[in-house]
Protein backbone atom coordinates (compact mmCIF):
# COMPACT_ATOMS: atom_id res chain seq x y z
CA UNK A 1 0.00 0.00 0.00
CA UNK A 2 1.32 3.42 -1.00
CA UNK A 3 1.33 6.04 1.76
CA UNK A 4 1.25 9.73 0.81
CA UNK A 5 1.51 12.60 3.28
CA UNK A 6 1.52 16.39 3.05
CA UNK A 7 3.60 18.48 5.43
CA UNK A 8 2.20 21.86 6.40
CA UNK A 9 3.24 24.31 9.08
CA UNK A 10 1.61 26.77 11.43
CA UNK A 11 3.71 29.48 9.77
CA UNK A 12 6.71 29.88 7.50
CA UNK A 13 10.14 28.96 8.93
CA UNK A 14 8.76 26.41 11.38
CA UNK A 15 11.21 23.68 10.35
CA UNK A 16 9.05 21.73 7.90
CA UNK A 17 12.05 20.52 5.90
CA UNK A 18 14.21 19.30 8.78
CA UNK A 19 11.23 17.44 10.26
CA UNK A 20 10.42 16.04 6.80
CA UNK A 21 13.97 14.74 6.48
CA UNK A 22 13.66 13.03 9.88
CA UNK A 23 10.36 11.41 8.90
CA UNK A 24 11.84 10.21 5.61
CA UNK A 25 14.79 8.64 7.43
CA UNK A 26 12.48 7.02 9.99
CA UNK A 27 10.29 5.59 7.22
CA UNK A 28 13.37 4.26 5.42
CA UNK A 29 14.50 2.54 8.63
CA UNK A 30 11.02 0.97 8.81
CA UNK A 31 11.54 -0.62 5.39
CA UNK A 32 9.73 1.79 3.08
CA UNK A 33 10.96 3.06 -0.29
CA UNK A 34 10.80 6.77 0.54
CA UNK A 35 10.63 9.92 -1.55
CA UNK A 36 10.47 13.60 -0.67
CA UNK A 37 8.61 15.92 -3.03
CA UNK A 38 8.55 19.72 -2.95
CA UNK A 39 6.41 20.66 -5.95
CA UNK A 40 6.83 24.42 -5.58
CA UNK A 41 9.70 26.32 -3.96
CA UNK A 42 10.92 29.90 -3.72
CA UNK A 43 14.40 31.04 -2.78
CA UNK A 44 17.16 29.10 -4.50
CA UNK A 45 20.71 28.88 -5.68
CA UNK A 46 22.28 28.65 -9.11
CA UNK A 47 23.24 25.26 -10.47
CA UNK A 48 24.42 24.21 -13.91
CA UNK A 49 20.90 22.92 -14.60
CA UNK A 50 19.26 26.15 -13.39
CA UNK A 51 18.00 27.23 -9.97
CA UNK A 52 17.44 24.82 -7.10
CA UNK A 53 16.10 25.15 -3.61
CA UNK A 54 18.02 24.12 -0.46
CA UNK A 55 14.94 22.52 1.10
CA UNK A 56 14.47 20.39 -2.00
CA UNK A 57 18.13 19.36 -1.89
CA UNK A 58 17.68 18.08 1.69
CA UNK A 59 14.51 16.19 0.74
CA UNK A 60 16.37 14.57 -2.16
CA UNK A 61 19.25 13.51 0.10
CA UNK A 62 16.83 12.15 2.71
CA UNK A 63 14.92 9.98 0.21
CA UNK A 64 15.88 6.32 -0.14
CA UNK A 65 15.18 6.20 -3.88
CA UNK A 66 17.22 8.04 -6.50
CA UNK A 67 15.45 11.14 -7.80
CA UNK A 68 16.54 13.95 -10.10
CA UNK A 69 16.43 17.60 -9.02
CA UNK A 70 13.46 18.16 -11.31
CA UNK A 71 11.55 15.19 -9.94
CA UNK A 72 11.87 16.47 -6.38
CA UNK A 73 11.18 20.12 -7.21
CA UNK A 74 9.56 20.71 -10.62
CA UNK A 75 8.68 24.38 -10.01
CA UNK A 76 11.47 26.47 -8.49
CA UNK A 77 11.67 30.26 -8.21
CA UNK A 78 14.99 31.97 -7.46
CA UNK A 79 13.62 34.84 -5.35
CA UNK A 80 12.25 34.31 -1.85
CA UNK A 81 8.62 35.43 -1.98
CA UNK A 82 5.17 33.78 -2.11
CA UNK A 83 5.00 31.46 -5.15
CA UNK A 84 1.81 32.96 -6.61
CA UNK A 85 3.40 36.44 -6.64
CA UNK A 86 6.60 35.20 -8.28
CA UNK A 87 4.49 33.25 -10.74
CA UNK A 88 2.73 36.44 -11.82
CA UNK A 89 5.90 38.51 -12.21
CA UNK A 90 7.84 35.79 -14.00
CA UNK A 91 4.90 34.70 -16.16
CA UNK A 92 5.36 31.12 -15.00
CA UNK A 93 1.95 29.69 -14.14
CA UNK A 94 1.52 27.13 -11.36
CA UNK A 95 -1.06 24.54 -12.33
CA UNK A 96 -2.39 21.84 -10.06
CA UNK A 97 -2.10 19.40 -12.96
CA UNK A 98 1.67 19.89 -13.01
CA UNK A 99 1.90 19.20 -9.27
CA UNK A 100 -0.16 16.04 -9.73
CA UNK A 101 1.96 14.87 -12.66
CA UNK A 102 5.10 15.08 -10.53
CA UNK A 103 3.43 13.26 -7.64
CA UNK A 104 2.18 10.48 -9.92
CA UNK A 105 5.69 10.02 -11.33
CA UNK A 106 7.19 9.62 -7.84
CA UNK A 107 4.38 7.26 -6.82
CA UNK A 108 5.56 4.83 -9.50
CA UNK A 109 8.95 4.56 -7.75
CA UNK A 110 8.12 4.88 -4.05
CA UNK A 111 5.63 3.53 -1.51
CA UNK A 112 6.10 6.24 1.15
CA UNK A 113 5.92 9.80 -0.14
CA UNK A 114 6.23 13.03 1.79
CA UNK A 115 5.08 16.19 0.04
CA UNK A 116 6.28 19.45 1.54
CA UNK A 117 4.17 22.54 1.03
CA UNK A 118 5.22 26.18 1.12
CA UNK A 119 4.41 28.34 4.15
CA UNK A 120 1.13 27.52 5.87
CA UNK A 121 -2.09 25.71 5.03
CA UNK A 122 -3.71 28.32 2.79
CA UNK A 123 -0.59 29.40 0.87
CA UNK A 124 -1.85 30.40 -2.62
CA UNK A 125 -0.68 28.69 -5.79
CA UNK A 126 -2.49 31.24 -7.95
CA UNK A 127 -5.29 33.79 -7.71
CA UNK A 128 -7.83 30.95 -7.46
CA UNK A 129 -6.04 27.90 -6.05
CA UNK A 130 -4.28 27.17 -2.76
CA UNK A 131 -2.09 24.27 -1.70
CA UNK A 132 -5.01 23.06 0.43
CA UNK A 133 -7.29 22.63 -2.60
CA UNK A 134 -4.65 20.50 -4.32
CA UNK A 135 -4.12 18.40 -1.17
CA UNK A 136 -7.86 17.75 -1.02
CA UNK A 137 -7.90 16.81 -4.70
CA UNK A 138 -5.06 14.31 -4.16
CA UNK A 139 -6.56 12.95 -0.90
CA UNK A 140 -3.28 13.38 0.98
CA UNK A 141 -3.05 12.90 4.74
CA UNK A 142 -1.76 16.06 6.43
CA UNK A 143 0.91 16.36 9.11
CA UNK A 144 1.17 19.68 10.97
CA UNK A 145 4.58 20.97 12.05
CA UNK A 146 4.28 23.31 15.04
CA UNK A 147 7.28 25.46 15.92
CA UNK A 148 7.28 25.90 19.69
CA UNK A 149 7.27 29.66 20.15
CA UNK A 150 5.01 32.51 21.22
CA UNK A 151 1.80 32.41 19.16
CA UNK A 152 2.07 28.75 18.16
CA UNK A 153 -0.96 27.61 20.17
CA UNK A 154 -3.41 29.87 18.38
CA UNK A 155 -1.83 29.14 14.98
CA UNK A 156 -1.95 25.39 15.61
CA UNK A 157 -5.61 25.37 16.65
CA UNK A 158 -6.58 27.46 13.62
CA UNK A 159 -4.56 25.26 11.26
CA UNK A 160 -6.12 22.02 12.50
CA UNK A 161 -9.63 23.51 12.37
CA UNK A 162 -9.00 24.64 8.77
CA UNK A 163 -7.81 21.18 7.71
CA UNK A 164 -10.80 19.47 9.34
CA UNK A 165 -13.25 22.00 7.86
CA UNK A 166 -11.79 21.21 4.43
CA UNK A 167 -12.71 17.56 5.11
CA UNK A 168 -9.12 16.39 4.91
CA UNK A 169 -7.56 13.78 7.18
CA UNK A 170 -5.02 15.15 9.66
CA UNK A 171 -2.62 12.32 10.43
CA UNK A 172 -0.98 14.07 13.34
CA UNK A 173 1.22 16.89 14.56
CA UNK A 174 4.84 17.28 15.57
CA UNK A 175 6.26 19.82 18.00
CA UNK A 176 9.52 21.30 16.70
CA UNK A 177 11.83 23.09 19.13
CA UNK A 178 13.35 25.77 16.91
CA UNK A 179 14.88 27.64 19.85
CA UNK A 180 17.04 26.36 22.74
CA UNK A 181 14.84 24.78 25.37
CA UNK A 182 13.46 27.09 28.05
CA UNK A 183 11.23 26.53 31.08
CA UNK A 184 8.01 27.12 29.13
CA UNK A 185 8.52 24.73 26.20
CA UNK A 186 6.80 21.74 27.83
CA UNK A 187 3.93 23.99 28.92
CA UNK A 188 3.35 24.97 25.29
CA UNK A 189 3.31 21.30 24.30
CA UNK A 190 0.99 20.32 27.17
CA UNK A 191 -1.47 23.03 26.12
CA UNK A 192 -1.32 21.81 22.52
CA UNK A 193 -2.06 18.27 23.73
CA UNK A 194 -5.19 19.61 25.42
CA UNK A 195 -6.46 21.42 22.32
CA UNK A 196 -5.23 19.57 19.23
CA UNK A 197 -7.39 16.52 18.51
CA UNK A 198 -5.14 14.91 15.87
CA UNK A 199 -2.58 12.27 16.95
CA UNK A 200 0.56 13.55 18.65
CA UNK A 201 3.57 12.12 16.79
CA UNK A 202 6.32 13.48 19.01
CA UNK A 203 8.82 16.23 19.70
CA UNK A 204 11.87 17.21 17.66
CA UNK A 205 14.60 18.63 19.92
CA UNK A 206 16.55 21.80 19.23
CA UNK A 207 19.66 21.14 17.14
CA UNK A 208 22.76 23.32 17.32
CA UNK A 209 24.15 21.54 14.28
CA UNK A 210 21.53 20.29 11.83
CA UNK A 211 24.21 18.43 9.87
CA UNK A 212 24.88 16.05 12.76
CA UNK A 213 21.53 14.53 13.70
CA UNK A 214 21.23 11.08 15.27
CA UNK A 215 17.92 10.02 13.74
CA UNK A 216 17.65 6.89 15.88
CA UNK A 217 17.47 8.98 19.06
CA UNK A 218 14.62 11.20 17.88
CA UNK A 219 11.42 9.79 19.33
CA UNK A 220 8.74 10.60 16.79
CA UNK A 221 6.20 8.16 15.37
CA UNK A 222 5.36 7.70 11.73
CA UNK A 223 1.82 8.79 10.80
CA UNK A 224 -0.71 6.11 9.88
Swiss-Prot record:
This protein's UniProt keywords: ATP-binding, Biotin biosynthesis, Cytoplasm, Ligase, Magnesium, Metal-binding, Nucleotide-binding
Ranges annotated as spanning the membrane: none
Q: Which GO terms describe its molecular function?
A: ATP binding; dethiobiotin synthase activity; magnesium ion binding
- EC no. given is 6.3.3.3
Where on this chain does ATP bind? 13-18, 55, 116-119, 176-177, 211
Catalysis performed (reactions) = (7R,8S)-7,8-diammoniononanoate + CO2 + ATP = (4R,5S)-dethiobiotin + ADP + phosphate + 3 H(+)
Q: Is Disulfide bond among the key words of this record?
A: no
Please list the residues that make up the active site: 38
One term under GO cellular component: cytosol
The primary site where this protein sits is: cytoplasm
What domain of life?
Bacteria
* InterPro entries attached to this UniProt entry: DTB_synth_BioD (IPR004472), P-loop_NTPase (IPR027417)
Cofactor(s) essential for the protein: Mg(2+)
**Is the keyword Magnesium in the record?**
yes
Q: Which Pfam families does the protein's record reference?
A: AAA_26
Q: Which residues bind Mg(2+)?
A: 17, 55, 116
Pathway the protein acts in: Cofactor biosynthesis; biotin biosynthesis; biotin from 7,8-diaminononanoate: step 1/2
The record's top EC class is ligase
What biological process terms from GO does the record include? biotin biosynthetic process
Where on this chain does substrate bind?
A: 42
Cell compartments where the protein resides: Cytoplasm
Biological function: Catalyzes a mechanistically unusual reaction, the ATP-dependent insertion of CO2 between the N7 and N8 nitrogen atoms of 7,8-diaminopelargonic acid (DAPA, also called 7,8-diammoniononanoate) to form a ureido ring.
Q: Which family does it belong to?
A: Belongs to the dethiobiotin synthetase family.
Self-association and partners:
Homodimer.
According to UniProt, the name of this protein is: ATP-dependent dethiobiotin synthetase BioD
Q: Which gene encodes it?
A: bioD
